[in-house]
């Protein structure tokens, strides 16, 4: 049987690293088994779903190389949900309810005060036909699924054996009074119709899974296998939000995080395997195993992405960055030498721009007061550009002879005068790239 997985985000905001974890696991399972990966946009919320978020989700996944085989939109399947709802009504598994949110809240509080679980009391099943007709006229009804009050069990791919007593769960609301089909129902219909065989999602969906198993069975379908990964928290243990901009994929991309660095961290975070940098999707897939992930909440610190990004960037061949370097205005003759000099001194590729500005426009000299006279003497001995690989050695030898300085007292002030920095690439490699020197003799 072909493995079919899906990633089903709601386009109500930009996706963050928590969403990515779900997407990556489902993508990896499909790709590793030669199966099908579906991107399904769960956009039945007409008020909050936006095309800009749908576009952003697809752009983020494309940036990461998480390609999909099929694109589905729930908004295109409303007729199918209506058909499935009709089937369940005729089977006696859908029933109409009329309580207002306030009335439901009062019932819930009363049960809690009595020390009982806040489970819906199925009062709507006891209404007469006359009462239903009257209430339907007065306020309109919403629809619940009638759960079989028995234990729902499955072997979870991460959490192990799961058993939930359906009697401890309220019959889920599947269609609102305004006709909007809710996630629990639409997702169940889609997963059966689309032949989904394996679903990985967050541990906050475990109860949903129990009810959806019954919904799928009531439709005559075979529920897929499930695995529920732990939820990510922020570095301090705080909950992640889809609208928490600093952890959205958009923001991480803007900060220069490389796709493979992000995927490498997410493919191992919360598992029994150590985090390591993968340079290709194939390397990542070879070591991926959903069974290695644990149930405990997992802390995500965005700062962990930058050592991985630095490692990834510094290992890139010139051919991978040639176009970016040329776009900075680096002459072809200097492009490859520039990369050799700059690559070990950048954290993200965006840092290349700063280095080329330094080389092409000159750096603001950093001159300590006690070195001012020394720098004036030294700069008087520096010829005009262009410079060659031998320039640094010849110049520092001349300065040493003229001033008597040597060692760090010679080299550090000269470096700071030319580059504005106390540390950096070898100056013998820097000199051929310098187009301008702003320090004066």
Swiss-Prot record:
Principal subcellular localisation of the protein: cytoplasm
InterPro entries documented for this protein: aa-tRNA-synth_I_cd-bd, aa-tRNA-synth_I_codon-bd_sub2, aa-tRNA-synth_I_CS, aa_tRNA-synth_I_cd-bd_sf, Glu-tRNA-ligase_bac/mito, Glu/Gln-tRNA-synth, Glu/Gln-tRNA-synth_Ib_cat-dom, GluQ/Sye
SUPFAM superfamilies found in the cross-reference section: An anticodon-binding domain of class I aminoacyl-tRNA synthetases, Nucleotidylyl transferase
Renumbered ranges of motif 'HIGH' region: 9-19
Protein's name in the database: Glutamate--tRNA ligase 1
GO biological process: glutamyl-tRNA aminoacylation
Location relative to the cell: Cytoplasm
């Amino acid at each position: 049987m072909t493995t079919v997985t899906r990633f089903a985000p709601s386009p109500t905001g930009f996706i963050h690293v928590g969403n990515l974890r779900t997407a990556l696991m489902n993508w990896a399972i499909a790709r590793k088994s030669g199966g099908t990966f579906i991107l399904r946009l769960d956009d039945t919320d007409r008020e909050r779903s936006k095309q800009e978020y749908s576009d952003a989700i697809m752009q983020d996944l494309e940036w990461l190389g998480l390609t999909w085989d099929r694109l589905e939109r729930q908004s295109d399947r409303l007729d199918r949900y209506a058909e499935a709802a009709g089937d369940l009504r005729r089977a006696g598994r859908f029933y109409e309810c009329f309580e207002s949110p306030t009335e439901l809240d009062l019932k819930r509080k009363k049960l809690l005060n009595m020390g009982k679980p806040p489970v819906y009391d199925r009062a709507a099943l006891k209404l007469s036909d006359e009462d239903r007709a009257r209430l339907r006229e007065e306020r309109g009804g919403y629809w619940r699924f009638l759960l079989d009050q028995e234990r729902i069990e499955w072997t979870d791919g991460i959490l192990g054996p799961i058993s939930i007593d359906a009697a401890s769960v309220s019959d889920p609301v599947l269609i609102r009074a305004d006709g909007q089909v809710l996630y629990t129902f639409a997702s169940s219909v889609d997963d059966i119709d689309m032949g989904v065989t394996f679903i990985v999602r967050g541990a906050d969906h475990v109860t949903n899974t129990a009810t959806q198993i019954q919904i799928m069975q009531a439709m005559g379908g075979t529920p897929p296998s499930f695995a529920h990964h732990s939820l990510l928290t922020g570095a301090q243990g705080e909950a992640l939000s889809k609208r928490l901009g600093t952890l959205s994929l958009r923001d991480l991309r803007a900060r220069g995080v490389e796709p493979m660095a992000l995927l490498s961290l997410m493919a191992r975070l919360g598992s029994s395997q150590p985090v390591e940098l993968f340079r290709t999707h194939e390397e990542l897939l070879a070591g991926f195993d959903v069974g290695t992930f644990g149930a405990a909440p997992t802390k995500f610190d965005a700062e962990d992405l930058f050592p991985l990004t630095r490692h990834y960037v510094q290992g890139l061949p010139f051919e991978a960055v040639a176009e970016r370097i040329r776009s900075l205005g680096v002459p072809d003759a200097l492009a490859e030498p520039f990369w050799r000099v700059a690559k070990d001194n950048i954290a993200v590729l965006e840092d290349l721009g700063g280095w080329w500005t330094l080389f092409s426009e000159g750096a603001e000299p950093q001159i300590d007061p006690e070195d001012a006279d020394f720098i004036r003497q030294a700069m008087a001995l520096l010829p005009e550009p262009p410079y060659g690989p031998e320039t640094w050695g010849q110049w520092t030898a001349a300065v040493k002879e003229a001033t008597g300085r040597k060692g760090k007292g010679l080299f550090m002030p000269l470096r700071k005068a030319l580059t504005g920095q106390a540390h950096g690439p070898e100056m013998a490699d820097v000199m051929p790239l310098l187009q301008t020197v702003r320090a004066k003799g």
